[in-house]
Curated annotation (Swiss-Prot):
It is found in: Cell inner membrane. Keywords: ATP synthesis, Cell inner membrane, Cell membrane, CF(1), Hydrogen ion transport, Ion transport, Membrane, Transport. SUPFAM superfamilies: N-terminal domain of the delta subunit of the F1F0-ATP synthase. The keyword Endoplasmic reticulum does not apply. This is ATP synthase subunit delta. It is a peripheral membrane protein. GO terms for cellular component: plasma membrane; proton-transporting ATP synthase complex. PANTHER family: ATP SYNTHASE DELTA CHAIN (PTHR11910). F-type ATPases have 2 components, F(1) - the catalytic core - and F(0) - the membrane proton channel. F(1) has five subunits: alpha(3), beta(3), gamma(1), delta(1), epsilon(1). F(0) has three main subunits: a(1), b(2) and c(10-14). The alpha and beta chains form an alternating ring which encloses part of the gamma chain. F(1) is attached to F(0) by a central stalk formed by the gamma and epsilon chains, while a peripheral stalk is formed by the delta and b chains. Transmembrane segments: none annotated.
Length: 179
């Protein structure tokens, strides 16, 4: 997947430069919506059909998004360029990299929190507050539940992983005892 990331990076950076001249949040919404549409196998099938023109594919993509930016000339040019270069399948990766650029500009990061049990509002706020102090930046959490952790949480922020789960502690103890 590193190849996809390498190919998608210039598109994401160019789109981000365009977005800096306007509303970054609105562009983020547009690119996320386009990525969702591009994930649909039906759309990729239509896009690769020789019976459908490139202009029709671009119009289909833009018609499928709700964002008001979809009607703008810059958005149309971006989508048309992706269609012309056969890069529609890159939209999810472009969206991911666009979000990373947006987070970097805001001094924030996405945090994936996996807990053994569901976290209520107060527990989640307390956990996120502590994690923000540890990672020294604002975090945008996404929470999932995985009962196989037995207890505790596993937090992933960028390429850093903080695993305080019981399963990780048991694995660590097992490694220490068998070494």
């Amino acid at each position: 997947m590193a190849e996809l990331a390498t190919i998608a990076r210039p598109y994401a950076e160019a789109l981000f430069r365009v977005a800096e001249g306007g509303d970054i949040a609105a562009w983020s919404t547009l690119v996320q919506e386009l990525a969702q549409v591009a994930r649909l196998p039906e759309v990729l099938s239509v896009a690769s059909s020789p019976k459908v023109t490139r202009t029709q594919v671009a119009e289909l993509l833009l018609a499928a998004v709700k964002s008001p930016l979809g009607a703008g000339a810059e958005a149309k040019n971006f989508v048309q360029m992706l269609v012309d270069n056969h890069r529609i399948a890159l939209l999810p990766e472009i969206a991911e990299q666009f979000e990373a650029l947006k987070n970097e500009r805001e001094g924030a990061a996405d945090a994936e929190i996996v807990s053994a049990f569901p976290l209520n509002g107060a527990d989640l706020e307390s956990l996120v507050s502590g994690l923000e102090r540890k990672f020294k930046r604002k975090l945008k959490p996404t929470v999932a539940v995985d009962s196989s952790l037995i207890g505790g949480v596993r937090v992933t922020v960028g390429d850093e992983v903080l695993d305080t789960s019981v399963r990780a502690r048991l694995a660590s103890m097992q490694a220490a005892l068998t070494a």
